[in-house]
Amino acid sequence: MRGFWLRQNDNQKLMKVRDTMDAVKDAPTIDFAKMDGLVPGIVQDAKTGEMLMLGFLNETSYRKTIETGFVTFWSRTRQKLWMKGETSGNRLRVLSASTDCDQDTLLFLVDVEGDGLVCHEGTVSCFTRPVPFGSAQGKAVL
């Protein structure tokens, strides 16, 4: 296996890292066709288990995520690649990733760099607004 050694700055452990070509080649095939070239990417904090956010990836952002080790989305609003936290410093370093059974959704377990505020509204998670669900009679209220 080709590769190189990378010394991580945060804990000075040596880890084996494959080169970019091998990493992209070995990555699972994701079904980008179902949603017009995009797949949802769920981001979960590896330390706390908290769901932090959901974004969308296209083939280019998926490759970029694999190449850099940081979650990179496709911004549907700005129509461009978007490495989450590149400006704020709260980058999402991928510790592991998996796909669902249909291979059309990704789950990233991440270590959040910076102050840990992932949401653009200044919160740790984008999931902060409760949805009233249920009533005294046990029926869903939507």
What do these predicted ranges mean?
Residues 2-8, 137:
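Short Gly/Ser/Thr- and charged-rich N-terminal loops/segments
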Residues 19-38, 46-47, 51-52, 57-142:
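C-terminal binding/interaction regions
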